[in-house]
Each structure stands twice: as C-alpha cells, then as structure tokens.
From Swiss-Prot:
Its cofactor is a divalent metal cation. GO terms for biological process: nonfunctional rRNA decay; nuclear-transcribed mRNA catabolic process, no-go decay; nuclear-transcribed mRNA catabolic process, non-stop decay; ribosome disassembly; RNA surveillance. Its EC number is 3.1.-.-. It comes from the Archaea. It holds the Pfam family eRF1_2. It is an enzyme of class 3 (hydrolase). It comes from Thermococcus gammatolerans (strain DSM 15229 / JCM 11827 / EJ3). This is Protein pelota homolog. InterPro entries: eFR1_2_sf, eRF1_1_Pelota, eRF1_2, eRF1_3, Pelota/DOM34_N, Pelota_arc, Ribosomal_eL30-like_sf, Transl-rel_pelota.
Length: 357
C-alpha cells in the first residue's frame, strides 16, 4: 500500500491499494460514517427530448460516498463501499442517491474520517510494512499428495493441491517414475507461484520422509528453487498440517515477523494459560474490562469483527486504556484458525502481567 497524501486537519488520507492484503486492511480502516472518494462508473439516465425513452449510459465520475455498508469480497478481490453520494465531479449526478464504490488492486481512494483512531493508523502502517515483507508459502507433502498455501496478512489461502497415484511397492520402477512426475509437477507449481507472488522462501513440511526425498530431488533438478526451501516436520498433511507449521513458530523463524503466525501463537498461549488455570489469561468482555481496570493487561487480543459490531466504542475504549498502560493491542483476523478460536472465546482475550483473582 502507498500513502499518497495526508491532510491531518481535515481527517483525510489518500492511498493506493496494491495487493489483496491492502484491500483487507482498507476493509478494517473504513467505518460507517466515513466519506470515501474514488473514480467510479455510474449508470446515468439520459433523455434527449420528451418524446424519446430514457437512454441509460455508464459514465466515469469522481464520487464521494458516505459509507453505510462496507464489504470485503476476497474471491473477487474487492472492497465495496455503499452509501449516499455526498460529492460528485459532475453536476448531472444527483447528491443523496446511493452508489457503491468498488476498491480493487490499483485503486486510488481517499478516506475522510471525523477522527482517525490509533488502530486505524496502525492498520495503515502495517499495510505499508507488509508490502516490504516477503509472503509466506507453506507446502505440506506426503506420498502422492501435496497442498500449497500462502500465509497472507488476512489469513491462510489454499492455492493449489497436487495428487498423483504412485502405485504399490515403494521401490517399484513404475512407482519411482510416477514419484518423479509428481515431484516435477509440484516443483513447477511452486516455482510459478513464487515468481508470480514474489516469494523468497518456501517451507516444505510433512509427516514422513517424502519431504526429504523431494528436497533432494530439488537439489538435483531445481537447484535455485532448492535454495529457497526450508524443511519442517508435521504429524499430518492438509490444512491441519499447514496450521501445525504456523503454530510451531517456523514461519516466524524464517520470516521473522508475520502477522498470522503471531496471532495464532498468541491465541494458543491464551488457551494454554486457561487450560492450566494459571490466572495469567482471561477472556470475555466483562472479565477483560476488569483486568484492564487493574492495569493487568500485557497483551489484548481483539477479534477484528468486534470493531464493526455493537460494542465497538466500548472495545475501542479498552484498546486505548491498554495502550495508555503500555500494553500491546493485537487485532486478530477472523480469517484463520486462531481467529476462529478467539471467536469461540467471545472475540476478546488478554494475557496478564499478574493475576487479578
């Protein structure tokens, strides 16, 4: 994401969305009541005279829309902002009519808020920093099967699955040739994805010895790709295996700082404290508020959905109080396993400096 212009006194920030992750961040930055400005297309009825029927034309126009509905469509790679028009660059576009501005990769958009809050500013900073970091690829592999996922800023995206029937005995000649074809297919898919997504490293993991066999195959046949691969153990394959890699901290070790890895590990830490009844973690709005009032919160975990819910202002007050007490606030994406587990806890949890009960 690029910040193109800032006018703090007017509450205006102009940005350019460059990736799907940027769209995810913008979805969480734009709130109901904000005014969003962008170039857009609008259907406009044109009538040349009273005897002719109206002709509908699609016209390019620069509009400002007061946001009422904000939706993130990750499969369409779009954020859609719907609301009444409050500004139009053309006089023939009536104000007050409803319009949907579609924000896509490459869209330049201006956001005007009554007040930019701390978590909004942090979101934009995160998006800018994320654009400088490599994305994470995880490949989980076993005999004749491999799944590839990208760990994006908003969550885990399964991007490819490769399956090949290798036949029976392990050292059968046909089996060996089928395994080589399987390895070639996987290597080519990885290379294409890494080039397209500008990925510098890939974690290859699995429960058996196939991952080592594949790595050896890469060293012999795709040496440049082999240099970008890190090997890790998992007990299972599939999506569960991918999350196992994240929980083990491999992503952090390879990429140092990754949002999803950090969020998943923090939620797991909360669950561990709760299971052991240490008193150093709490969850639920009332319980977390009590811990905040004692100044006991070291890390506050907030599910992103809560910042668009009915308790939004109450949650934002808690976030400000934790920051004032020099605690850390982490907004957890609802798009990954850690977010799902936090949602089961009510969407709000905290790691504590000391026991409050």
């Amino acid at each position: 994401m690029q910040i193109l212009e800032e006018k703090p006194k007017e509450g205006i920030v102009k940005v350019k969305a460059e990736t799907l992750d940027d769209l995810w961040h913008l979805y969480h930055v734009i709130d109901p009541g904000d005014v969003v400005y962008a170039k857009t297309l609008r259907k406009q009825a044109q009538r040349s005279d009273s005897l002719r029927a109206e002709k509908v034309e699609v016209i390019p126009v620069y509009l400002g829309v007061k946001a009422e509905k904000i939706n993130f469509h990750k499969f369409a790679n779009q954020v859609r902002v719907t609301g009444p028009i409050v500004y139009a660059s053309r006089d023939d576009v009536p104000l007050g009519k409803y319009h949907t501005i579609t924000i896509e990769e490459g869209t330049v958009v201006t956001i005007q808020k009554p007040r930019w809050k701390e978590h909004h500013i942090e979101r934009l900073k995160e998006a800018i920093e994320a654009s400088k970091r490599a994305k994470v690829m995880i490949v989980v592999i076993d005999e004749g099967e491999a799944d590839i996922a990208l760990v994006r800023e908003y969550g885990v995206e399964m991007v490819a699955s490769i399956r090949r029937n290798l036949g029976g005995k392990r050292y059968n000649t046909d089996r060996e040739s089928e395994e080589k074809r399987f390895f070639h297919d996987l290597a080519k898919t990885m290379a294409e994805l890494m080039e397209r997504e500008k990925i510098e490293k890939a974690i290859v993991a699995g429960p058996g010895f196939v991952k080592e066999d594949f790595h050896k195959f890469l060293r012999e046949n795709y040496p440049e790709l082999a240099k970008k691969v890190v090997i890790e153990d998992t007990s299972v394959t599939g999506r569960t295996g991918i999350y196992e890699v994240i929980k083990r901290g491999t992503v952090d070790r390879v990429y140092h700082e990754n949002r999803v890895a950090k969020e998943v590990q923090l939620v797991e830490k909360v669950l561990e404290h709760v299971a052991r009844n240490t008193g150093l973690a709490t969850y639920g709005l009332r319980e977390v508020e009590e811990a905040v009032n004692y100044g006991a919160v070291e890390t506050l975990l907030v599910l992103d959905e809560l910042l668009k819910g009915e308790h939004r202002e109450r949650i934002e007050e808690l976030m400000d109080a934790v920051r004032y007490a020099r605690g850390e606030v982490v907004i957890v994406s609802s798009e990954h396993e850690g977010g799902e587990k936090l949602k089961a806890l009510g969407g709000l949890a905290a790691l504590l400096r000391f026991r409050v009960k």
